[in-house]
Regions:
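Flexible, solvent-exposed loop/hinge segments and secondary-structure transition points
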Residues: 22-161
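Positively charged n-region of N-terminal signal peptides that target proteins for export
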Residues: 1-4
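Bacterial N-terminal signal peptides
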Residues: 6-18
């Protein structure tokens, strides 16, 4: 019996010990509502300067909506498209244009990726080399949507912890 308990103790410490020695939690930097407002404000200023009628959606790292703006006279359909572009950029940690380019190049399997929208205009928000959220813009041409989104995302370089 003692040998059996000793054996179990050795196996337990060998297999479980290293797992317990590692941290079970990590610290993450999260995008705040204030940060989302700053991102949207820059994007909105660029859109208005260009006379663009767009929806601006800002999501957190997991793709949950933090802020949504629909500029005056923007088509209603752009609301969901803008959110989907932002979510795509957040959960896949790359611009939504990547998926659009894949489809254009014949890789239609990109359309089957869960939660991915193959439309240009979603851009990750990066702070300290990590994706902390994303911005999606919809309502104008694909390249104009992306330019507005990139302007908003760029403000993250000024953020502080």
């Amino acid at each position: 019996m003692k040998k059996h308990l000793a054996f179990v103790a050795v196996v337990f410490s060998t297999l479980v010990g290293p797992v317990l020695a590692h941290a079970q939690l990590i610290e993450k930097t999260a995008l705040t509502l204030d940060g989302a407002k700053k991102i949207a404000a820059v994007a909105e200023a660029k859109a208005k300067a260009e006379g663009a009628r767009v929806v601006i959606a800002v999501v957190d790292e997991g793709g949950s909506l933090l802020l949504l703006e629909r500029l005056d006279d923007t088509q209603v359909a752009s609301v969901n498209v803008g959110i989907d572009k932002a979510r795509t950029a957040a959960i896949y940690r790359r611009p939504s244009k990547v998926f659009e380019d894949q489809v254009k190049n014949g890789r239609v399997s990109a359309l089957a990726l869960h939660g991915a929208v193959a439309l240009q205009g979603g851009v990750p928000v990066i702070f300290d080399g990590k994706v902390i959220g994303a911005i999606g813009v919809s309502g104008e041409t694909p390249s104009q949507d992306e330019d507005i989104a990139m302007a908003g995302a760029a403000v993250a370089a000024t953020f502080t912890k």
